[in-house]
């Protein structure tokens, strides 16, 4: 089994869901999310956000295909502040990690997101 450290850099795009990480195929067995950092660069606009894992094929108990499992709902992100999630999250084949910004998303590019993870093949 090989382990590779990776990171994604994203900038908010209004209320469109941003895919932070995905385990889409059988070449990657697992991903361990190490940290998610969200920085609100706006000087005056507060935001809230949701972070969830989408179970694409419905392989988990209790949900069907495309069920959303929330880690955060309406989490506060004040102007000029940073939110850091640094608890590990295990993801398997056909799981996707998303972040969605609130409808108060003007300016739309004010939240910068960095996701660090360990890819295990």
Language-model region placement:
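C-terminal interaction-tip segments
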Residues: 1-31, 41, 55-58, 92-94, ...
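Beta-strand-rich interaction surfaces with strong enrichment in secreted/lumenal proteins
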Residues: 7-8, 22, 72-76, 86-88
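Solvent-exposed, conformationally flexible loop/turn segments
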Residues: 13-18, 76-82
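Ser/Thr- (and often Asn-) enriched beta-sheet segments in non-cytosolic proteins
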Residues: 19, 48-50, 74-76
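Residue-level detector of short, conserved catalytic/binding motifs and their immediate flanks
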Residues: 34, 49, 95
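Short, surface-exposed beta-strand/strand-loop-strand elements in extracellular ectodomains
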Residues: 43-71
């Amino acid at each position: 089994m090989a382990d590779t450290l990776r990171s994604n850099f994203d900038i908010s795009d209004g209320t469109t869901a941003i895919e932070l990480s995905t385990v889409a195929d059988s070449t990657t067995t697992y991903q361990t999310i190490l940290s998610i950092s969200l920085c609100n660069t706006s000087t005056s606009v507060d935001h809230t956000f949701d972070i969830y894992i989408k179970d694409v094929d419905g392989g988990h108990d209790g949900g069907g295909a495309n069920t959303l499992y929330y880690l955060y709902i309406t989490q506060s992100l004040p102007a000029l502040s940073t939110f850091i999630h640094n608890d590990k999250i295990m993801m398997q084949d056909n799981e996707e990690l998303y972040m969605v910004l609130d409808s108060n998303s003007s300016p739309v590019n004010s939240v910068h997101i960095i996701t660090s993870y360990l890819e295990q093949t």
